[in-house]
């Protein structure tokens, strides 16, 4: 379907070469200041034509808010946003071979099988142009999360092809065992990431190696994949649902819905499978003396006296999630992107009707590697997941706070989303 989320619902629309793309966002809290200026920076980070190693398609991707705000303030009603497709070239796809042959590893064939008809230009609905609506909606979610809780979301390119920022070694099979990676998790900012354009890998040497590799594949009319790592800091504890809607499951759902994704791992991930439990377990320690980040100190939660979690963990192999529920530590995960399917090299493939084979040389304008522009898309989907989980937790505890206190419990104040909570105690304790 084209809708994501339960409480913060985002519906995207549009195809690669239609007149516009965009979204409708339902569930935005009323009373938040919001203009296009809050959304445009992320749109600009996502847009094509950023450098010599991205698609040359010339789109400004200027977002227009159509509804849901008045005088720059959210009304609590659905917010509609659109971006015009200004540099459409459907004629690039109307040549004889691309009408006859489905592109290898693209969605041409599968969309035709599903719908019985498909867009003849670009990837249609499967195009990365669809993610414009996601990024616009994610910017709204992110603003609320930062104002309310001081949440910070930062993604960066962690590998391109065989070039890694933190290559696996015998000592560090997972980056989560590497002190340098954990230092990066706690300190990386978007400003730092964007100072390493065009690749967005926050290390000068690795960034150069990755750029050279992408350039090599571009010059050969080929493509190469890679990974994007994302960090979410200052997340309230208690987010996520048991069983089927665990927080990491919802993050995986969100990330694997992004075009060209092929893999997802959270925390220590697959490398953590090689680490013994005696090392992998994250011991709890008191968070009493933990330094409060400036964004948290300035948040609505701090102003309203909502306490920070009482505990934190000494290590963070779990990636900030245990039992499917956030524990307050930084959440980090990695998303794998395949090489872009559309390449300029000639490829032998079958016709749509399967009666013969021929040679397809795809036309159009495409990224030799999608990972540099995937960074803000990953951030946006992360924001949508956390926003939805926050609203679910707020709804649950608001409903609970209106009930009379249970006789066998003692109220211990407020939880990390700002509602009264109770601690279970023995009846003998109540008599003392």
From Swiss-Prot:
One of its GO terms (biological process) is amino acid biosynthetic process. InterPro entries: Chorismate_synth, Chorismate_synth_AroC_sf, Chorismate_synthase_CS. Residues 406-432 are annotated as: Disordered. One of its GO terms (molecular function) is riboflavin reductase (NADPH) activity. Disulfide bonds: none annotated. GO terms for cellular component: cytosol. Pathway: Metabolic intermediate biosynthesis; chorismate biosynthesis; chorismate from D-erythrose 4-phosphate and phosphoenolpyruvate: step 7/7. It comes from the Eukaryota. Pfam families: Chorismate_synt (PF01264). Bifunctional chorismate synthase and flavin reductase that catalyzes the conversion of 5-enolpyruvylshikimate 3-phosphate (EPSP) to form chorismate, which is the last common intermediate in the synthesis of the three aromatic amino acids phenylalanine, tyrosine and tryptophan. Acts also as a flavin reductase (FR) able to generate reduced flavin mononucleotide in the presence of NADPH. PANTHER family: CHORISMATE SYNTHASE (PTHR21085:SF0). Homotetramer. This is Chorismate synthase aro-2. It comes from Neurospora crassa (strain ATCC 24698 / 74-OR23-1A / CBS 708.71 / DSM 1257 / FGSC 987).
């Amino acid at each position: 379907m084209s809708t994501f989320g339960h409480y913060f619902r985002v519906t995207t629309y549009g195809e690669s070469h239609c007149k516009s793309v965009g979204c409708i966002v339902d569930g935005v809290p009323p009373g938040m200041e919001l203009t296009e200026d809050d959304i445009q920076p992320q749109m600009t980070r996502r847009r094509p034509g950023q450098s010599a190693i991205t698609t040359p398609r010339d789109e400004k991707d200027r977002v227009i808010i159509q509804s849901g705000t008045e005088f720059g303030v959210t009304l609590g009603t659905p917010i509609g946003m659109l971006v015009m497709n200004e540099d459409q070239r459907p004629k690039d796809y109307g040549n004889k071979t691309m009408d006859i042959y489905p592109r290898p590893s693209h969605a041409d064939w599968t969309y035709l099988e599903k719908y019985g008809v498909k867009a003849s230009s670009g990837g249609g609905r499967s195009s990365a142009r669809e993610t414009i609506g996601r990024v616009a909606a994610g910017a709204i979610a992110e603003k609320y999360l930062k104002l309310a809780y001081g949440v910070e979301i930062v993604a960066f390119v962690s590998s391109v092809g065989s070039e890694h920022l933190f290559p696996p070694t015998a000592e560090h099979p997972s980056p989560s065992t590497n002190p340098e990676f954990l230092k990066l998790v706690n300190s990386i900012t978007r400003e730092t990431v964007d100072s390493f354009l065009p690749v967005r890998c926050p290390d000068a040497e690795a960034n150069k190696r990755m750029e050279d590799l992408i350039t090599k594949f571009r010059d050969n009319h080929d493509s190469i994949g890679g990974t994007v790592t994302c960090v979410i800091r200052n997340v309230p504890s208690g987010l996520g649902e048991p069983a089927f809607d665990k927080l990491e499951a919802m993050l995986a759902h969100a990330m694997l819905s992004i075009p060209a994704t092929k893999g997802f791992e959270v925390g220590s991930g697959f490398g953590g499978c090689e680490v013994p439990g005696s090392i992998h377990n994250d011991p709890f320690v008191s968070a009493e003396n933990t330094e409060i980040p400036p964004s948290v100190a300035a948040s609505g939660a701090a102003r309203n006296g909502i306490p920070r979690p009482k505990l934190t963990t000494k290590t963070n192999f779990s990636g900030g999630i245990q039992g499917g529920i956030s524990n307050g530590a930084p959440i980090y995960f990695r998303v794998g992107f395949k090489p872009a399917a559309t390449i300029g090299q000639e490829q032998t493939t079958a016709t749509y009707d399967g009666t013969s084979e021929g040679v397809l040389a795809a036309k159009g304008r495409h990224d030799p590697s999608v990972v540099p522009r995937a960074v803000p898309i990953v951030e946006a989907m992360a924001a949508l997941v956390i926003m939805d989980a926050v609203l679910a937790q707020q709804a649950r505890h608001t409903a609970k706070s209106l009930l009379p206190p249970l006789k066998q419990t003692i109220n211990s104040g407020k939880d990390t989303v700002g509602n009264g909570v109770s601690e279970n105690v023995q009846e003998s304790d109540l008599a003392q």
